[in-house]
Amino acid sequence: MTFPNINPIIFSIGPLAISWYSLSYVIGILLGWFYANKIIEKFKPQITKKNLEDFITYAVIGIIVGGRLGFVLLYNPSRYFSNPIDILKTYEGGMSFHGGALGGIIAAYLFCRKYKINFLSFTDIIAPVVPIGLFLGRIANFINGELYGRITNASFGMIFPNSDLMPRHPSQLYEAFFEGLVLFSILAHATFKHKTLKKCGLNSGIFFTFYGLFRITIEIFREPDIQIGFILDSLTMGQILSVPMLLLGSYLICQSNPK
């Protein structure tokens, strides 16, 4: 299959370029805010809509700064240390989910400490929202023709213009499906059907567990970053960074269901 060559820049106004990647962040945050409000309306937890509104600024800063610094420090430090100005070129892509997650967690912790909100109760409301941004971000990765998969002989293998013109797994779409749609469905079912907000930390644990599991599995089909390659001969950076998430998620689930 031939990659549908889509311009990663939607439009430009002078030096300002609006990319699909940037748009995915904006839409993801807006849809996430809307969905989190619906959860608050339904279950009326101690966290209020005003709390959520106040948190948006924290979230945006934490996600963008954390995501960018995570990519710079973990995936391509030599390039950015040689050309620091490139760190600001977020429209080219280059955001780390793990960095963004850590930035978001730190932002949530600081916010909860300031407003005296239970941290895990707050992240339990945020957890069902995150897959929305993950889905849109992976679609943007696909449009950019980046983070493609390994070479495959399968009929659905896709030739990406920035690769070696060999058919490859469209791993961005695999991630959009599992980390986005499937994980969203799991958390929505847990939240609305099984009332998991009643157990502090359970939603957060479900998110971390399934994200870690999905990411570790899909990395088998994803081409490792060329500047890093394989670690210990067979592992990717994404897999290594996802193991702590899987362990943390399992711990939170166990803690939310004490015997």
UniProtKB/Swiss-Prot annotation:
GO terms for cellular component: plasma membrane. It is found in: Cell inner membrane. It is a multi-pass membrane protein. Pathway: Protein modification; lipoprotein biosynthesis (diacylglyceryl transfer). Belongs to the Lgt family. GO terms for biological process: lipoprotein biosynthetic process. Keywords: Cell inner membrane, Cell membrane, Membrane, Transferase, Transmembrane, Transmembrane helix. InterPro entries: Lgt. The chain crosses the membrane at residues 9-29, 55-75, 92-112, 117-137, 172-192, 201-221, 228-248. Catalyzes the transfer of the diacylglyceryl group from phosphatidylglycerol to the sulfhydryl group of the N-terminal cysteine of a prolipoprotein, the first step in the formation of mature lipoproteins. Its EC number is 2.5.1.145. HAMAP family: Lgt (MF_01147). Pfam families: LGT. This is Phosphatidylglycerol--prolipoprotein diacylglyceryl transferase. GO terms for molecular function: phosphatidylglycerol-prolipoprotein diacylglyceryl transferase activity. A 1,2-diacyl-sn-glycero-3-phospho-(1'-sn-glycerol) binds at R138.
